[in-house]
A protein has these predicted regions:
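Cleavable N-terminal export/targeting peptides
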Residues: 1-12
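Surface-exposed strand-loop-strand hairpins of Gram-negative outer-membrane beta-barrel proteins
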Residues: 26-56, 122
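Solvent-exposed loop/turn segments connecting transmembrane beta-strands
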Residues: 51-56, 79-91, 101, 121-127, ...
Length: 171
């Protein structure tokens, strides 16, 4: 039976997390005309709308600091890059929730804010983006974690548009 064991950061050391996965796997976004000579449906030389809702491969590096706030929250910094030249650097807070007596099953909710640079894919409507989500890990006896993270990235209505993007990352 799965039972909640302890809330709070168990490890006293900082932790590096690396992973890879899919950026914008739900293919949110929109199509936009990028024809400077007229509309996309112009009879002479018109172009089709350009889609900004493709998914791509994402690479992730995060560092979780050992210092805790309120004995629960751990600050962390991270960086994502995609194979379509989109980049996102962020800072946020996480909390490790341990399950089972072995403390080997961990759920880590996270919340972060950062700076996003659009690449050749989804346009998120603003440079400032917020990321919410979490990780589900199995922690081995040597403290190595293996898991998956699911996240939503959004500008929270700060920009002209707010299509948002989702990420699934194996860590």
């Amino acid at each position: 039976m799965l039972s909640f064991y302890k809330i709070g950061a168990f490890e006293k050391k900082g932790r590096l997390s690396v992973g890879g996965g899919i950026h914008n796997y739900m293919e949110n976004g929109f199509e936009r005309c990028e024809n400077p000579k007229g509309g996309c449906n112009a009879p002479s030389g018109g172009t089709a709308p350009v889609s900004y809702k493709d998914s791509s491969t994402v690479y992730s590096v995060e560092y979780f600091f050992s210092k805790r706030l309120i004995n629960i929250l751990k600050p962390f910094v991270g960086f994502n890059g995609t194979d379509k030249d989109a980049y996102y650097g962020y800072f946020g807070f996480s909390a490790d929730l341990y399950f089972l007596n072995c403390k080997c099953f961990i759920i880590t909710p996270t919340l972060a804010a950062g700076w996003y640079i659009d690449g050749d894919e989804i346009k998120l409507g603003n440079r400032v983006q917020f990321r919410s989500g979490g990780d589900i890990y199995y922690r081995f006896k040597n403290n190595v974690r293996l898991g998956v993270g699911l996240y939503h990235i959004s500008n929270a209505g700060l920009g002209d548009s707010n299509p948002g993007a989702e990420q699934a990352i194996l860590k």
